[in-house]
Amino acid sequence: MCKIIVGGCSFTYNEGSWAHHIPNVINVARGGSGPITSAREVLVKLRETTGNKICIFQVSNPSRKEIIINDQNRLLFNRYNPQPLDENICGTSYYHVKGFGGTTTINKQYKKAIETFVTTMSEEQRAVESYEMLTLLQLYCKYNSIPLLMFYGWLDKRDLKGELIQKILQGIDWTVWWKQGNETMSSWLKENGHKDRK
């Protein structure tokens, strides 16, 4: 039996998402996470899963960034109580705090401090690092003959600006992307009569 390993953000993680309609699915998506965290979770699960498998990967906002918390930096974030979906990064005792594109804490002052820390990196740098990780996922699947389908949740490649990100995008294999990365699943759902739950 073929196992289907899926990753992404809340678009894939939340109950009732597309991933919950697939049999034999192993869903390692994390709500609010960016592509780096999501791809890392998928890569680890692909290595740990034996037998036939395929991978479906939903790309969230490429400028999202998380900070992994372990014993080395735990004291810096000791006022933060992680949500369950932010714990056990790749099955470890580590957790992460989300700075951009995700809820970190109800303490607004602390949330602002984390966002300031994370956003010292430009959106382009965060996107570059995300697409480098997506390139790694593509290469891993190709090397191990694992069929891969990738798609954008709501932002497609047309939203990416900057000289460096344009160079990095040249290394992406767009043949494994739904609509070659020129459309989002959100737009397809709306065009086909699906309603937003909000």
Stretches found by the model and what they are:
Residues 1-49:
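Serine-esterase "nucleophile elbow" of acetyl-processing enzymes
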Residues 43-197:
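Alpha-helical cap/lid subdomain in secreted, periplasmic
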